Structures are given as C-alpha cells and as structure tokens.
Amino acid sequence: SVYVKASTVDIRSIIEPLIGHDLTVTQSKHSTKMSFTKSNDEYVMRELMRLIGNGTHHSTMRMNPELFGITADEKKALLKGIADVTGYIRKSNIAFGQEGAHRVYIEIPGNWYMVIDIANMLKAIDVPVQTIDFGHPNFRDGKLVKYNEGKPNFWKKEHQVKIFANEFLAVGFNIQHKQE
C-alpha cells in the first residue's frame, strides 16, 4: 500500500507537467487507476496518438518508427517510463536460482508488436534482453499440463521481456522502490 501510494506520486509528478493537466486517481482493493480527459484536438493528444501508432487500446499500440531515431538519453527516458508502469523487479525474478542473476520483467499484456518494439529499443541502447516469454500456449503450457488439469486458459498471460538487473541499470526506474 505504501509502495503503491509512493509510485502514484512518482508517476503523477512526471506525467502531469507533460500533459498540462491533473490526473484523477481512483483506487480499489486490487488496482489503482490514473486517468485524465483532454480533447483529441489538443496538440499533446495528437502527438501522443501519433507516437503510439494511433492505438486506442493497449493491444493496438505500436511505437512510431520515429521513436527509434531519438537520442539515446530520450530512448532511456522512454524505456524508464514504460518500466515504471509495467516493469517489475522482485526476489522471485531470479534466473534459475543463480545468486546475483536477478532480472527486471517488463510485462506487456496482449500486444505482440509492443514486445518487439521494446526489445528493439533496448537493443538500440545496448541493453541486452535475456529472454522473451510470449503469452502463447507453446511457451506457457507446451506439454498441456495445466490444460489437462482443467485450466484451458492458463497460457493466456502477459508477454514478458526479461533483462538482467545489472544490465538494466543503464535504464533504471523513476520509482524509488523499484530502483532500490
């Protein structure tokens, strides 16, 4: 709860000046939602839509090819923003139980293209991706173990881009508890 509130403050302090508008924060038992309303005619909205390929749902957003031409520092800032929202670093993210092999997971639900865009953006700044786990039945339940246990939708999970934490330091997080 403390982390969620701290994260919300961190994210708001970054986004609100960019959009020139206060975010509305709504909390429930299991989620925190931040939203804002602006006219699609406003410049910031036109630019935002252009940069996400006019995607109107998380599953239809793409990185505009122009983003791959921005400076390395701008790419890091973009990736840091993505990681703040959908990146995780937990004790359980250790690779194969190896000491010092912690990983950052960037989780992308239902968008095959954004996974590749993020991996290519990381590659462009020389941050290697350790692995990508796609939310696909061959990756998540290839031997049909969970399926045969009566869980036919077990495989329907987010895609995960996994990066070793020491490599991800070049990008980092704005959110303090994730960075620590």
Language-model region placement:
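Internal intein/HINT superfamily modules and their associated LAGLIDADG
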Residues: 1-180
